[in-house]
Structures are given as C-alpha cells and as structure tokens.
Amino acid sequence: SVNTKNDFMRF
C-alpha cells in the first residue's frame, strides 16, 4: 500500500 505503517497495522 501507499502507507507501509498502515499496512502493518492492518495485519
């Protein structure tokens, strides 16, 4: 995704 931080939070 554009925001890696958000991606990690998702998982």
UniProtKB/Swiss-Prot annotation:
Superkingdom, natural source: Eukaryota
A biological-process GO annotation: neuropeptide signaling pathway
Transmembrane regions listed in the UniProt entry: none
Subcellular location: Secreted
GO cellular component term of the entry, any: extracellular region
Annotated positions of the Phenylalanine amide modification: F11
Keyword Isomerase attributed: no
UniProtKB keywords: Amidation, Neuropeptide, Secreted
Keyword Secreted (UniProt): yes
Family in the record: Belongs to the FARP (FMRFamide related peptide) family.
Protein known as: CalliFMRFamide-9
Organism: Calliphora vomitoria (Blue bottle fly)
